[in-house]
Amino acid sequence: HLEVDKIWHLACPASPKSYQLNPIKTAKTSFLGTYNMLGLARRVNAKFLMASTSEVYGNPELHPQPETYHGSVNPIGIRSCYDEGKRIAESLCMDYKRMHGCDIRIARIFNTYGPRMLPDDGRVISNFIVQALKNESITIYGDGSQTRSFCFVEDMIDGFILLMNSNYMEP
């Protein structure tokens, strides 16, 4: 018997390089991991916080995206194991809230960076840093007018704690 009052569900590789190595495992981690943790939250009446992602918006046609935006997604693309996995995980969270009264929180993370970030994880910050350190040209995809939201890891943790301790239960 496990006694907990808060569950912090942060499991799932977030680096494209990592989640594309085993896309089936990535999707299973999002779905089954969330399902199992929500079951535990329901059994022990624990608050539940799930780390989701900005990737639930897919390739958004609206910038910046409000939480009410439903996105523009590709359910069968090479990134879909991560994007769709997080979308179904959010759906499960909201269904457990509606059907079982679970006390859930969903944090949609955008481009976190900080110490011990792997230099080859395939995300923009690490790519920029590695290229700059090698005195290489910085790779910009598109025409350079794109925008991204970045969050320092310590700020993200502070946000998680504030969200878990709040009464806010929407993404």
PLM regions with names:
Residues 127-133:
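Activation segment of eukaryotic-like protein kinases
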Residues 106-109, 121-126, 137, 144, ...:
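Conserved loop-to-helix N-cap of the C-terminal "lid" that shapes the substrate pocket in Rossmann-like
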Residues 21-22, 116-121:
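Short, solvent-exposed loop/turn segments at secondary-structure boundaries
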